[in-house]
UniProtKB/Swiss-Prot annotation:
Lineage per the UniProt record: Eukaryota, Viridiplantae, Streptophyta, Embryophyta, Tracheophyta
Record's protein name: (E)-beta-farnesene synthase
A single BP term in Gene Ontology: diterpenoid biosynthetic process
Chain residues that bind Mg(2+) 1: 286, 290
Residues that span the membrane, as ranges: none
GO molecular function, one term: magnesium ion binding
Pathway: Secondary metabolite biosynthesis; terpenoid biosynthesis
C-alpha cells in the first residue's frame, strides 16, 4: 500500500487541551458514587437468597461496567450458584444465564442442560424473546464438540432476525439488534456499558441507584481516560510524526481506545499508558517494515532492535534513527514509571518487540520470494506474532500489579496455547478485513490468499472459510480459558479481552487503519459524558 493512502490523524492535539465538562464536578461525583456503591452492595447481599435475582443482578452490574467494584461478592455468589441446585431448571432464561455467568467466570458447566429444551425431533422449543436472547448469548461460550450450542446459535439467530421485522418495545428492540451484531461475551466491556446504560434506563424494573452509579462510574472513568490521552498525545508529539514519519498510520488516540477496550478499569491506568505507547511503536515498526522501507533498510532496523543499544542507530537510514532512539528511551522510561520492584518487566517489552521484528522479517522474505505457505497453520505460525495482539496484550501486564509475576511473563513468552488462540483470532480477523486492500499493495500473501491459492476458491469463499477458522479459534480459547493454570486468572481474562478488541476493530473493516469508522464510538467513550438526568 502506498503510504500516502493512510489518512492523517482524526484527532491531532485535541486531547492535549480537552477536559470533559464533568471535570469541575469530580469531587461531588466521587462522593456520590461512594455512597451509591454501598447502597448497591446491600442490594447485592440481599439477592443471595434467590438464585434468579442474584443472576439478574450480576449480569446487570457486569453490563453496566460496575462489577469490578464487587469482585469478591460476585465470586462468592457464583460459587454458591455453582454448587446449588435450588433453581428452576425448566426456565430457559435462568438456565442460560446461569450457564453464561458460570462459564464466563471459569466454572466448567455442561452444555447438556440445554437438551431438555428440545422436542422429540431435536428442535428447540422457544418463543419468548428474553429466553432467545439469553440462550443465544450463552451458546457463544462454547468449546469444540458442543453440537447443542451450535444448533442453539442457528435456531436463535433465525428467530431473533424474524423478531426485528415486527414492532418491539424500544429497549427490547435495542437488545435484539445489539445481540445479533455481537454476542454479549464478545463485546468490549466499556463499550457495552456505554451502550447498555440508556437501554437499562428504559427498563421498567430498573434500580435507580444502580443506574445513577453506572452513569457516575462512567463519567469518572472518562476523566481518567482523558488525562491518559493528554499524556500519550504529548509523548507521541515528540516523534514529530507529520514531518519525520509522514508515511505511517498516525493513530495514537485509536491505540489508547484499543487498550481501554481491553483494560477499562480505572486502576489499570499505568497499564493502559504503557500498552498504548507499545501499540503505537509497533504500528510504526509495522508501517516501516511492511509498507515503506526497502528490504535492506528493514533488515537493518531488525538488527538494531536485536542489539538494543544506542550506537546501533548509526547503521540506520536517517528517517529511522530518531525513531529507534526514541523507542529505546521510551522503554527505559517505562522502567522508571514501574519503580524498582517492577522495572525488570521492561526486559519483556524488549523481547516482545524482538518477536515482532523477527516475524516481520520472515514475512518480508516470503514477499520477496513470492512464497506461499503450504497450510494455514504454517502461515499462522509466522504471521500470528506480527499482528501485534501478543505484544500489546503482554505489554498491558507490564503496568499491572504484583500478582502478575516474573513466572507469568516467562510463561507468556513460551507462546502457550491460550496466547496462540489470541494471535490466531487477531490474524484471521485482520486478514478478512484487509485482504482486498493488501492484495493490491504488494504485501505478502494473507491467510485468505493462501487458502485461495491452495484450494482454488474465490476470495469470498476463502473469507467464509477463514471466518470458520476464526470461530474454531474462539472455541480453542474458551476451552483453554476454562482450564485452570498456576497463573492469575487475570492473565486469561485479559487475553480474552484483547480477542474482543480484535473482533471489534476488524469486524467489518480495518477500523484501526481506516479509523473514521470508529470515530463516533471514540467520541462516545472519551468526549461525551453521560447525562445524569
Amino acid at each position: 500500500m502506498d503510504a500516502t493512502a493512510f489518512h492523517p490523524s482524526l484527532w491531532g492535539d485535541f486531547f492535549v487541551k480537552y477536559e470533559p465538562p464533568t471535570a469541575p464536578k469530580r469531587g461531588h461525583m466521587t462522593q456520590r458514587a461512594e455512597l451509591l456503591k454501598e447502597e448497591v452492595r446491600k442490594t447485592l447481599k440481599a439477592a443471595a437468597n434467590q438464585i434468579k435475582n442474584a443472576l439478574d443482578l450480576i449480569i446487570t452490574l457486569q453490563r453496566l461496567g460496575l462489577d469490578h467494584h464487587y469482585e469478591n461478592e460476585i465470586s462468592e455468589l457464583l460459587r454458591f450458584v455453582y454448587s446449588s441446585s435450588d433453581y428452576d431448571d425448566k426456565d430457559l432464561y435462568v438456565v442460560s444465564l446461569r450457564f453464561y455467568l458460570l462459564r464466563k467466570h471459569g466454572h466448567r458447566v455442561s452444555s447438556d442442560v440445554f437438551m431438555s429444551f428440545k422436542d422429540e425431533e431435536g428442535n428447540f422449543v422457544v418463543d419468548d424473546t428474553k429466553c432467545l436472547l439469553s440462550l443465544y448469548n450463552a451458546a457463544y461460550l462454547m468449546t469444540h464438540g458442543e453440537k447443542v450450542l451450535d444448533e442453539a446459535i442457528t435456531f436463535t439467530r433465525r428467530q431473533l432476525e424474524a423478531l426485528l421485522l415486527d414492532p418491539l418495545e424500544p429497549a427490547l428492540a435495542d437488545e435484539v439488534y445489539l445481540t445479533l451484531q455481537t454476542p454479549l461475551f464478545r463485546r468490549l466491556r466499556i463499550l457495552e456499558a456505554v451502550n447498555y446504560i440508556p437501554i437499562y434506563g428504559k427498563e421498567a424494573g430498573r434500580n435507580e441507584a444502580i443506574l445513577e452509579l453506572a452513569k457516575l462510574n462512567f463519567n469518572l472513568a472518562q476523566l481518567i481516560y482523558c488525562e491518559e490521552l493528554k499524556e500519550v498525545t504529548l509523548w507521541w508529539k515528540q516523534l514529530n510524526v507529520e514531518t519525520n514519519l509522514s508515511f505511517i498510520r498516525d493513530r495514537i488516540v485509536e491505540c489508547h481506545f484499543w487498550m481501554t477496550g481491553a483494560c477499562c478499569e480505572p486502576r489499570y491506568s499505568l497499564s493502559r499508558v504503557i500498552a498504548t505507547k507499545m501499540t503505537a511503536l509497533i504500528t510504526v515498526l509495522d508501517d516501516m517494515m511492511d509498507t515503506y522501507s526497502t528490504t535492506e533498510e528493514a533488515m537493518l532496523l531488525a538488527e538494531a532492535i536485536y542489539r538494543w543499544e544506542e550506537n546501533a542507530a548509526e547503521l540506520l537510514p536517517g528517517y529511522m534513527k530518531h525513531f529507534y532512539l526514541y523507542l529505546l528511551k521510551t522503554i527505559d522510561s517505562c522502567g522508571g514509571e514501574l519503580g524498582p520492584n517492577r522495572s525488570f518487566r521492561t526486559f519483556y517489552l524488549k523481547e516482545m518487540l524482538k518477536v515482532f521484528v523477527r516475524g516481520s522479517s520472515q514475512e518480508i522474505k516470503w514477499r520477496n520470494e513470492n512464497y506461499v505457505p503450504k497450510t494455514i497453520s504454517e502461515h499462522l505460525e509466522h504471521s500470528g506474532p506480527t499482528v501485534g495482539a501478543f505484544q500489546v496484550a503482554c505489554s498491558s501486564f507490564v503496568g499491572m500489579g504484583d500478582n502478575i509475576t516474573k513466572e507469568s511473563f516467562e510463561w507468556l513468552l513460551t507462546y502457550p496455547e491460550l496466547v496462540k488462540s489470541l494471535m490466531n483470532i487477531a490474524r484471521l480477523l485482520n486478514d478478512t478485513a484487509s485482504t482486498k486492500r493488501e492484495q493490491t499493495a504488494g504485501h505478502h500473501v494473507s491467510t485468505v490468499q493462501c487458502y485461495m491459492l491452495k484450494h482454488g476458491t474465490t476470495m469470498d469463499e476463502a473469507c467464509e472459510k477463514i471466518k470458520e477458522l476464526t470461530e474454531d479459534s474462539w472455541k480453542d480459547m474458551m476451552e483453554l480459558y476454562l482450564t485452570p493454570t498456576e497463573h492469575p486468572k487475570l492473565v486469561a481474562q485479559t487475553i480474552v479481552d484483547f480477542a474482543r478488541t480484535a473482533d471489534y476493530m476488524y469486524k467489518e473493516t480495518d477500523g484501526f487503519t481506516f479509523s473514521h469508522t470508529i470515530k463516533d464510538m471514540i467520541a462516545k467513550l472519551f468526549v461525551d459524558p453521560i447525562s445524569l438526568f
